[in-house]
């Protein structure tokens, strides 16, 4: 397949200088899978971005959890993609369900933010996913495809730096996790959508990762699925040793190959 495994850690609104330092120490250990087989990106709150970008070994990249839709201006409390790029931040998470549901971010708004972030050279972790009632109503694909459409305004080339994160909302922070078969089913559908609506090349190369109660106990089975190209990890990414286990689940790709 040729798609490099990708593991992102979304720390959300968590962490103190002490706890963050412990996670960094773990991630800097040589037991973490090599950079040539897995891309590791951590996403701390804004206040920790400069320090973690400096303190983490160079193989580990840093992402912001959000950015503003424009260059800057009179937008109190917002941070622009230009500012992030100036700090040396390389990725940004956009479209996370918590921002969609709690802050009312629409598909269109998320798409505009992603397009601007790309224009500033940031890689985008593009989040999609359905609510429990939408899954039970058989609307999983419809919901995910509508969300994908908002990201499809990218020209072909910038898709090289886009990772699609399928995060079923019913599995985020609930302890429930999609089965490996459920994850694979949606990832295949997403790849087919990209093939039809963007290009066959983009569909083949784009990494589609899974998020939603991923932990050290289930990551290996999920990673063994052909179209699961990695993870976006929430709570478990705050536990250094467990996050390391998830990163090292890339070994499942070698077993499955």
Swiss-Prot record:
Cellular component terms (Gene Ontology): cytosol
This protein's name: Triosephosphate isomerase, cytosolic
Keyword set includes Acetylation: no
Uppermost EC category: isomerase
Keywords associated with the record: Cytoplasm, Gluconeogenesis, Glycolysis, Isomerase
Subcellular location: Cytoplasm
HAMAP family xref list: TIM_B
Entries under NCBIfam families matching the protein: tim (TIGR00419)
Stored InterPro entries: Aldolase_TIM (IPR013785), TIM_sf (IPR035990), TrioseP_Isoase_bac/euk (IPR022896), Triosephosphate_isomerase (IPR000652), Triosephosphate_isomerase_AS (IPR020861)
One Pfam family recorded for the sequence: TIM
Miscellaneous notes: In plants, there are two types of TPIS, cytosolic and plastid.
Record-listed substrate binding positions: 10, 12
Native species: Stellaria longipes (Longstalk starwort)
Chain segments annotated as coiled-coil in the UniProt record: none
Known pathway: Carbohydrate biosynthesis; gluconeogenesis; Carbohydrate degradation; glycolysis; D-glyceraldehyde 3-phosphate from glycerone phosphate: step 1/1
Catalytic activity: D-glyceraldehyde 3-phosphate = dihydroxyacetone phosphate
């Amino acid at each position: 397949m040729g798609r490099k495994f990708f593991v992102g850690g979304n720390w959300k609104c968590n962490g103190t200088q002490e706890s963050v330092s412990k996670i960094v120490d773990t991630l800097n250990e040589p037991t973490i899978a090599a950079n040539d087989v897995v891309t590791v990106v951590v996403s701390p709150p804004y206040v920790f971005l400069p320090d973690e970008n400096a303190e983490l070994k160079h193989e580990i990249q840093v992402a912001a959890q959000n950015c503003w839709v424009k260059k800057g201006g009179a937008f109190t409390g917002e941070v622009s993609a230009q500012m992030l790029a100036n700090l040396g931040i390389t990725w940004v998470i956009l479209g996370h369900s918590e921002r969609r549901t709690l802050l009312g971010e629409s598909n269109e708004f998320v798409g505009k933010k992603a397009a601007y972030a790309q224009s500033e050279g940031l890689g985008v972790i593009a989040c999609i996913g359905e609510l429990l009632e939408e899954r039970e109503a058989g609307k999983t694909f419809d919901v995910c495809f509508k969300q994908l459409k908002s990201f499809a305004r990218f020209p072909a080339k910038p898709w090289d730096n886009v990772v699609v994160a399928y995060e079923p909302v019913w599995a985020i922070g609930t302890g429930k996790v999609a089965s490996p078969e459920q994850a694979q089913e949606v990832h295949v559908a997403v790849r087919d959508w990209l093939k039809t609506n963007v290009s066959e090349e983009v569909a083949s190369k784009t990494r589609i990762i899974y998020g939603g109660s991923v932990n050290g106990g289930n990551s290996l089975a999920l990673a063994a699925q052909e179209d699961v190209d990695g993870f976006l990890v929430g709570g478990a990414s705050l536990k250094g040793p467990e996050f390391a286990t998830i990163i090292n689940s890339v070994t499942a790709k070698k077993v499955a190959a």
